[in-house]
Swiss-Prot record:
Localization in the cell: Cell membrane; Recycling endosome; Synaptic cell membrane; Cytoplasmic vesicle
Gene3D superfamilies, alphabetized: 1.10.287.70
Record InterPro entries: 2pore_dom_K_chnl, 2pore_dom_K_chnl_TASK, 2pore_dom_K_chnl_TWIK, 2pore_dom_K_chnl_TWIK1, K_chnl_dom
Identification of the protein by name: Potassium channel subfamily K member 1
Post-translational modification: Sumoylation is controversial. Sumoylated by UBE2I. Not sumoylated when expressed in xenopus oocytes or mammalian cells. Sumoylation inactivates the channel, but does not interfere with expression at the cell membrane. Sumoylation of a single subunit is sufficient to silence the dimeric channel. Sumoylation of KCNK1 is sufficient to silence heterodimeric channels formed by KCNK1 and KCNK3 or KCNK9. Desumoylated by SENP1; this activates the channel. Desumoylated by SENP1; this strongly increases halothane-mediated activation of heterodimeric channels formed with KCNK9.
Organism taxonomic ancestry: Eukaryota, Metazoa, Chordata, Craniata, Vertebrata
Function: Ion channel that contributes to passive transmembrane potassium transport and to the regulation of the resting membrane potential in brain astrocytes, but also in kidney and in other tissues. Forms dimeric channels through which potassium ions pass in accordance with their electrochemical gradient. The channel is selective for K(+) ions at physiological potassium concentrations and at neutral pH, but becomes permeable to Na(+) at subphysiological K(+) levels and upon acidification of the extracellular medium.
Keywords: Cell membrane, Cell projection, Cytoplasmic vesicle, Disulfide bond, Endosome, Glycoprotein, Ion channel, Ion transport, Isopeptide bond, Membrane, Potassium, Potassium channel, Potassium transport, Synapse, Transmembrane, Transmembrane helix, Transport, Ubl conjugation
Stretches buried in the membrane, not crossing it: 104-116, 117-122, 212-224, 225-231
Length: 336
């Protein structure tokens, strides 16, 4: 009897704090995934780093042996200055790009990477005035960019996601959940093809030193706003039509980022993912229900859209289809 009471009380305790348990598992899972990534990256990249260090030591020792008039401190001072300039996007190599890093098209490309928080790090402000302006420009520009992307994604999602799903649901009677899943998968496949595979093939042709994997890697790193900066297009030696190429890359990054956000928003609107996300949210109390606090669904990535406007939009979209079905039903009844 006591054991059954204890068991039932434990079950009630777990159910009462189910959201907290799920959140704790979520935090633990994220930390484990972080450690897993660190272990894999370290085991894969550390041997290559060690080989590169050994190769550089051999080259340095051989160079000093062949040029006895040059001391090691002088060589290190020269190399340090060269590396410092390279960090600012300036190279001393004769076959390096002779183009300026701060002409208009390059500055436009830099501004787009700053506002999208991609930040390759290949070109950075050199002067104190440029660094100060970059801070002010980013403080204003990044929220402005988020507002712009929110408005664009909301409008595109209405026409690309909600209307097609609602049409197949009302016109053909398919389950809204099933149509949403199929539509999200198809949209994701089209987006990956148009903004990853095809551009990767184009970059592998335009960039002499890039293969398809490196080009695909650049597309993913850029559109996911990681922006490591190890691959930057348009920086090759004697790049043809460099200005036009830079403008095209800027447009590609902006359109690709919008497409990625539309796909993410489409997946976040799936009923199954909404239920899954609610497992980790704090349940609202009755007092919270009485005041108009933002619902938990809006705390997810899908909060970038105005959900109240979305509901109204869906209602407006459903009216023509419902009216058409009612009129068709009335005509069939009159004919019989």
């Amino acid at each position: 009897m006591l054991q059954s009471l204890a068991g039932s009380s434990c079950v009630r305790l777990v159910e009462r704090h189910r959201s907290a348990w799920c959140f704790g598992l979520l935090v633990l899972g994220y930390l484990l995934y972080l450690v897993f990534g660190a272990v894999v990256f370290s085991s894969v990249e550390l041997p290559y780093e060690d080989l590169l260090r050994q190769e550089l030591r051999k080259l340095k020792r051989r160079f000093l042996e062949e040029h006895e008039c040059l001391s090691e401190p002088q060589l290190e001072q020269f190399l340090g200055r060269v590396l410092e300039a390279s960090n600012y996007g300036v190279s001393v190599l004769s076959n390096a790009s002779g183009n300026w890093n701060w002409d208009f098209t390059s500055a436009l490309f830099f501004a787009s990477t700053v506002l999208s928080t991609t930040g390759y790090g290949h070109t950075v402000p050199l002067s104190d005035g440029g660094k100060a302006f970059c801070i002010i420009y980013s403080v204003i520009g990044i929220p402005f960019t988020l507002l712009f992307l929110t408005a664009v994604v909301q409008r595109i999602t209405v026409h690309v996601t909600r209307r097609p799903v609602l049409y197949f649901h009302i016109r053909w009677g398919f389950s809204k959940q099933m149509v949403g899943i199929v539509h999200a998968v198809v949209l994701g496949f089209v987006t990956v093809s148009c903004f990853f595979f095809i551009p990767a093939a184009v970059f592998s042709v335009l960039e002499d030193d890039w293969n398809f994997l490196e080009s695909f890697y650049f597309c993913f790193i850029s559109l996911s706003t990681i922006g490591l900066g190890d691959y930057v297009p348009g920086e090759g030696y004697n790049q043809k039509f460099r200005e036009l190429y830079k403008i095209g890359i800027t447009c590609y990054l902006l359109l690709g980022l919008i497409a990625m956000l539309v796909v993410l928003e489409t997946f976040c609107e799936l009923h199954e993912l909404k239920k899954f996300r609610k497992m980790f949210y704090v349940k609202k109390d009755k007092d919270e229900d009485q005041v108009h606090i933002v619902e938990h669904d809006q705390l997810s990535f899908s909060s970038i859209t105005d959900q109240a406007a979305s509901v109204k939009e869906e209602q407006k979209q459903s009216e023509p289809f419902v009216a058409a079905q009612v009129s068709a039903y009335a005509e069939d009844s009159a004919s019989h």
